[in-house]
Amino acid sequence: MARLLWLLRGLTLGTAPRRAVRGQAGGGGPGTGPGLGEAGSLATCELPLAKSEWQKKLTPEQFYVTREKGTEPPFSGIYLNNKEAGMYHCVCCDSPLFSSEKKYCSGTGWPSFSEAHGTSGSDESHTGILRRLDTSLGSARTEVVCKQCEAHLGHVFPDGPGPNGQRFCINSVALKFKPRKH
């Protein structure tokens, strides 16, 4: 209760409340601590956007994929053949999701990664992603969403390269690439 009061004390009348999130885009990322970024500062994010606000912020294709759980056509994504070193962020909230070091060519038509950024062994608690059961096509698959804004990113399959055997099949349109600074 004390923490909630501390969070609310800076609000003035007419100010929309902000909610604490774990990590911050470009910092330690989601999962770095209980509402704290790397430097220990409280990271905040606006309340979840309404559908109309997402439609204003995103292109129609980005909205369809990230907010309506769509899929871009295979072999059409801008990042499919990207070989530049850097980080792939969520197009909706800028949370770091996947490193180019874990990207590989799976031949499936979508950018593929062997693990999410921040994975330690099989521990994904410090990554920017969440896994969810998806039964939308009549069979069970594992959906991958952004931990910070719940954007649909793609799916993960158990047919990837070793040692963990995972293939994160991610829509390019759900990503924003930031090249590594030299």
Swiss-Prot record:
Q: Which Pfam families does the protein's record reference? A: SelR
Gene Ontology cellular-component terms listed: cytoplasm; cytosol; mitochondrion
Chief location: mitochondrion
Give the range of the organelle targeting sequence: 1-20
Tissues of expression: Ubiquitous. Detected in retina, ocular ciliary body, skeletal muscle, heart, colon, bone marrow, cerebellum, small intestine, fetal brain, fetal liver, kidney, spinal cord, lung, placenta and prostate.
- Highest rank taxon of the organism: Eukaryota
UniProt-listed Enzyme Commission number(s): 1.8.4.12, 1.8.4.14
- Note how many cofactor molecules are bound and how: Binds 1 zinc ion per subunit.
Which of UniProt's keywords are assigned here? Metal-binding, Mitochondrion, Oxidoreductase, Transit peptide, Zinc
Identify the InterPro entries for this entry: Met_Sox_Rdtase_MsrB (IPR028427), Met_Sox_Rdtase_MsrB_dom (IPR002579), Mss4-like_sf (IPR011057)
SUPFAM superfamilies, from UniProt? Mss4-like (SSF51316)
Gene Ontology molecular-function annotations: actin binding; L-methionine-(R)-S-oxide reductase activity; peptide-methionine (R)-S-oxide reductase activity; zinc ion binding
> Required cofactors, per record?
Zn(2+)
Is Oxidoreductase a UniProt keyword of this protein? yes
* Binding residues annotated for Zn(2+), in chain numbering: 90, 93, 146, 149
Q: Give the positions the UniProt entry annotates as the active site.
A: 169 (nucleophile)
Q: How does it assemble?
A: Interacts with DAOA; the interaction is direct.
**Function field:** Methionine-sulfoxide reductase that specifically reduces methionine (R)-sulfoxide back to methionine. While in many cases, methionine oxidation is the result of random oxidation following oxidative stress, methionine oxidation is also a post-translational modification that takes place on specific residue. Upon oxidative stress, may play a role in the preservation of mitochondrial integrity by decreasing the intracellular reactive oxygen species build-up through its scavenging role, hence contributing to cell survival and protein maintenance.
- The name under which this protein is listed is Methionine-R-sulfoxide reductase B2, mitochondrial
